[in-house]
Amino acid sequence: MLMNMKELLKVADEKGFAVPAFNIGSDQLLKAVMQQVKEMKSPVILEMSPDEFNFVENSLIQSMIYEASKTDVPVVIHLDHGDKYETVVRAIQAGFTSVMIDASKLPYEENIAITQKVCEVAHLANVSVESELGTIGTTGNSIEGGTTGIIYTDPDQAKDFVEKTGIDTLAVAIGTAHGIYPSDMKPELRLDILQILKDTLDIPLVSVSYTHLTLPTNS
């Protein structure tokens, strides 16, 4: 069943489970992911980057919507790291149930302005909106890029941002990086910031790029 991100992550937060997200760039990958989703009865986020969205055939997007609508497992179709207002609007028109506007590299006030604009349009269509504060690093081997220096999400700024924009979910920067981590690269995860953000904000948080990353555990 099709859901937006706000609806799905609200349930996930209440029940205490995480929701995986997979970038879908081909019919083969879509079929493989959906087969596992149905077998495991696991909610999932099917997403596309702006490059994928701009270059794949519309038939793949329609296949994503069709596969999601014919299963009883919750499925979100999400535009990840939307780089322009126009791209986000096209994704909404194409049937995406969730969009991200990533203006985190812009000055703070500009980030607020474009995010507000996206929320106004998306919420009219019952599409949830994700935004980002701070920056995600790079391992040097990902097409998604990232920055060489990580700017961690500031909890006070995050609270102000959420209140002013009306976003539904927030992607936070706690030290992860896009791509697969080389053996000699050790991320400096700030789980303390993540906890403060969780305690401060009343919307679901999104944290990205955990591929091949071993999280610390309490002994």
Predicted regions mapped to residue ranges:
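Short glycine-enriched loops at secondary-structure junctions
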Residues: P50-E52, H81-Y85
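Conserved small/polar residues in nucleotide/adenosyl-binding loops
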Residues: T211-T217
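Glycine-rich anion/phosphate-binding loops
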Residues: G82, Y108-I114
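Alpha/beta enzyme core
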Residues: L8, D27-V44, I61-Q62, Y66, ...
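N-terminal basic/disordered segments at the start of proteins
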Residues: L2, N23-D27
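Short, surface-exposed connector motifs at secondary-structure boundaries
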Residues: D13-A18, S42-V44, T71-V73, K198-P204
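N-terminal amphipathic alpha-helix/helix-capping segment at the start of soluble metabolic enzymes
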Residues: M1-V19
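Hydrophobic faces of well-ordered beta-strands that scaffold small-molecule active sites
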Residues: V19-F22, V44-E47, V75-L79, V99-I101, ...
